[in-house]
Amino acid sequence: MSYNNTPEISVLLSTHNNENSINNSIKSIINQSFEDFELLIMNDASDDTTLKELKNFDDKRIKIFNNRSNLGLTKSLNLLLSKSSGKYIARQDADDISLKDRFTIQKKYIKKNNLKFCSARARSMHSNKKIPGVSFYIPEKVLFKYKNPHIHGTLFMEKKILEEVGGYDENFYFAQDFKLYCDLIKKNIKLARINKILYLMNTKDNISNKNKDEQRYYFECAKNNILPKVN
């Protein structure tokens, strides 16, 4: 199989000490039915065997980068964005799984509905429980009603709209995805959500579950358009 030098989709994945889950996460991407993509992976200073696991993959679409120190998700995603070449940006978390037709469905949905952004529904890989959320595009008044109506790992958008807002706001170590949604809404970008499960989430080890207080604080800062205080 030969691939274009300029892929249609750039997939951004940052990992820190995900040795037990990174293999399945990557496999779920390289086995997508839509094959014209690049998978950009940032090893964010892992001190377990994550890097070793990454090097086991022999796929020309995979590009591995390394941070010398742990920069966190927000800065790592911006670094990957700067190295991306696709028309579209897709997200993937290191401990989650994308279903086989995810990219095919999301790309078709965006083009059919003349959109620039969409997310998808997800299910917990541990309990078969659907992750709650809402459907179709989400106006500001609804966005602020929910804690976070879009699942970060399911994002699929035109690269140019992410660049237009300056990428992820690096003032937000947590809730960087919600801050992004706020920034996009200010640019009058419709935030659509496909009412279909395309993603499996690791709800046991999810960072949002481990850092609930920090997530809530940064969420409120984004919601109220104020900068978070950093200790």
Model-predicted segments: where are they?
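Acidic helix N-cap motif at the loop->helix transition within catalytic regions
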Residues: N20-N23, D48-N56, I97, D101
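Short, acidic, metal-binding catalytic loop of nucleotide-sugar glycosyltransferases
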Residues: K27-D36
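A conserved acidic beta->alpha catalytic loop
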Residues: N43-K52, S69, D93
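Acidic donor-diphosphate engagement hotspot in glycosyltransferases and nucleotidyltransferases
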Residues: T49-T50, L77, S98-F103, N128-K129, ...
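Glycine-rich, basic loop-to-helix element that forms the pyrophosphate-binding segment
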Residues: N67-S84, I105
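Conserved nucleotide-sugar donor-binding catalytic segment
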Residues: S82, P139-A222
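Short aromatic/hydrophobic "clamp" motif used to bind/position activated sugar donors
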Residues: I89
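Conserved donor NDP-sugar-binding/catalytic core segment of glycosyltransferases
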Residues: D101-P132
